[in-house]
């Protein structure tokens, strides 16, 4: 197999196999994600509306590595749409000091991007947010192909 005109052997020799495969599969992953979002649009909107129809709220996008990049990318489009109440933080910033990023009292929608949903970063985000936030809603985008919503 060849990716980016590099043979599998050449990629192994430069320790680039994982990265090359990760980049190569992104277009297909995003197509699947868009299709899934379209299929459950009404359900997702109803869940999100529980938060955004309140007088004040925060939407916090978070993830690590490429998952953080997803949140940062969506931030540009979502922040103006939601009256500049959207934030995007790296899990590595949020987990050790959630009180510096999360409101104790505002309704907060935590959108957690991750590959498996079981990484230390993903689990840490949830645990940290649950300690700080009294009115928390979770939306998990796992592997960018599975979405789960949960209210705590």
Regions found by a protein language model. Name each.
Residues 1-46, 50-53:
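Cofactor-/ligand-binding subdomain signature composed of acidic, glycine-rich
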Residues 53-148:
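Glycine-rich phosphate-binding loops that contact phosphosugars or nucleotide phosphates
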């Amino acid at each position: 197999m060849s990716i980016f005109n590099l043979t599998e052997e050449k990629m192994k020799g430069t320790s680039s196999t994982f990265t090359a495969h990760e980049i190569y599969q992104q277009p297909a992953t995003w197509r699947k994600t868009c299709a899934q979002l379209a299929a459950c649009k009404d359900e997702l909107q109803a869940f999100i509306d529980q938060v955004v129809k309140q007088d004040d709220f925060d939407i916090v996008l978070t993830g690590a590595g490429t998952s953080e990049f997803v949140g940062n990318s969506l931030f540009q489009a979502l922040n103006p749409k939601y009256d500049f109440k959207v934030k995007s933080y790296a899990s590595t910033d949020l987990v050790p000091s959630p009180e510096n990023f999360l409101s104790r009292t505002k309704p907060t929608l935590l959108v957690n991007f991750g590959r498996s949903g079981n990484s230390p970063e993903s689990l840490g985000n949830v645990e940290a947010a649950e300690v700080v936030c009294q009115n928390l809603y979770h939306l998990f985008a796992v592997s960018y192909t599975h979405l789960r919503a949960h209210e705590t």
